[in-house]
């Protein structure tokens, strides 16, 4: 016990704190203490330092689409442990745990809806579900979204957040790279726009396929984008990587992506962009 604690009487509060749990949150970048309701209004972007925190697939879709006329696509697809895969834990058990923790059946949510009144289809990866890894259900849902666009002449937007292919599905997972790329080729043939939004992180097989095949490839600020991670590359080449390597600003400078958009401006910016692509310039004045 310190000397100051000995001479000062022990203070006791007569009233309990009126601040309920869950009111405050902390920025993982600048450590600022933030009012949670304000953070939610900012779509999990720190108002102090503009750090873009990771958000769930459904929160992203909710913040992006209009609230009316929504319809989920591909929700009938469910993961199967075809290979009976087991590492330190059975794949079946990993799936059950991920489903319980996230409330999702797999790592991609696809939704038909409206963007400032313009019909669109949006896909969003759920990174909390096994690292947003690409697997059979992810590929099937993605293709379902593309097919809906082809049938109804709609633009397609995908928000990527993934560590890459799901190793527990082996070649079934890798096959989704070709499957999704072939589906997007049909979009291109029909002249329908596909906008790819790369968020933190977009890595591995997802970055090597659907994430970089957009007619327009945009990214959120400071998103990690690449194939292998920076630590793996440094260990392989035995050299220190440049500052900001694999971050969206670095990729924009090198011409790998087209633009960087703040999450809070994503809806209005893409609405204007797609309005021009679809000949609906009156979507957003």
Swiss-Prot record:
Catalytic activities: N(6)-carboxybiotinyl-L-lysyl-[protein] + acetyl-CoA = N(6)-biotinyl-L-lysyl-[protein] + malonyl-CoA
Pathway the protein acts in: Lipid metabolism; malonyl-CoA biosynthesis; malonyl-CoA from acetyl-CoA: step 1/1
Main location, first listed in the record: cytoplasm
A Pfam family per the record: Zn_ribbon_ACC
EC nos: 2.1.3.15
UniProt: Zn(2+) binding residues: 27, 30, 46, 49
Zinc finger boundaries on the chain: C4-type: 27-49
GO process annotations (BP): fatty acid biosynthetic process; malonyl-CoA biosynthetic process
Domain of life: Bacteria
Keywords: ATP-binding, Cytoplasm, Fatty acid biosynthesis, Fatty acid metabolism, Lipid biosynthesis, Lipid metabolism, Metal-binding, Nucleotide-binding, Transferase, Zinc, Zinc-finger
Any one GO cellular component localisation term in the record: acetate CoA-transferase complex
Cofactor descriptive note: Binds 1 zinc ion per subunit.
Location(s) in or outside the cell: Cytoplasm
Keyword Zinc tagged: yes
Names of the cofactor(s): Zn(2+)
Domain CoA carboxyltransferase N-terminal span(s) in chain numbering: 23-285
Coiled coil: none
Similarity-based family: Belongs to the AccD/PCCB family.
Function: Component of the acetyl coenzyme A carboxylase (ACC) complex. Biotin carboxylase (BC) catalyzes the carboxylation of biotin on its carrier protein (BCCP) and then the CO(2) group is transferred by the transcarboxylase to acetyl-CoA to form malonyl-CoA.
Record note on quaternary structure: Acetyl-CoA carboxylase is a heterohexamer composed of biotin carboxyl carrier protein (AccB), biotin carboxylase (AccC) and two subunits each of ACCase subunit alpha (AccA) and ACCase subunit beta (AccD).
NCBIfam families per record: accD
Name this polypeptide is given: Acetyl-coenzyme A carboxylase carboxyl transferase subunit beta
């Amino acid at each position: 016990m310190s000397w100051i604690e000995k001479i000062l009487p022990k203070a006791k509060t007569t009233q309990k704190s009126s601040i309920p749990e869950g009111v405050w949150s902390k920025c993982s970048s600048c450590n600022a203490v933030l009012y949670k309701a304000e953070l939610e209004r900012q779509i999990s972007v720190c108002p102090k330092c503009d750090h873009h925190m990771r958000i769930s697939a459904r929160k992203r879709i909710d913040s992006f689409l209009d609230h009316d006329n929504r319809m989920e696509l591909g929700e009938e697809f469910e993961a199967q442990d075809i290979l009976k895969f087991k590492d330190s834990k059975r794949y079946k058990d990993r799936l059950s745990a991920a489903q319980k923790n996230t409330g999702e059946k797999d790592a991609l949510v696809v939704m038909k809806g409206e963007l400032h009144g313009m019909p669109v289809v949006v896909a969003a990866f759920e990174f909390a579900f096994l690292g947003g890894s690409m697997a059979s259900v992810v590929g099937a849902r993605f293709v379902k979204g593309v097919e809906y666009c082809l049938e109804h002449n709609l633009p397609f937007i995908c928000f990527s957040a993934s560590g890459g292919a799901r190793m527990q599905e082996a070649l079934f997972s890798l096959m989704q790279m070709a499957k999704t790329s072939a589906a997007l080729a049909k979009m291109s043939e029909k002249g329908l726009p596909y906008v790819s939004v790369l968020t933190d992180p977009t890595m591995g097989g997802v970055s090597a396929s659907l994430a970089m095949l957009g007619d327009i490839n945009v990214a959120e600020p400071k998103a990690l984008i690449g194939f292998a991670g920076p630590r793996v590359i440094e260990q392989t080449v035995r050299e220190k990587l440049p500052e900001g390597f694999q971050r969206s600003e670095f990729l924009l400078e090198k011409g790998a992506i087209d633009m960087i958009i703040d999450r809070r401006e994503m809806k209005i910016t893409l609405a204007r962009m797609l309005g021009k692509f679809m000949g609906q310039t009156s979507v957003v004045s």
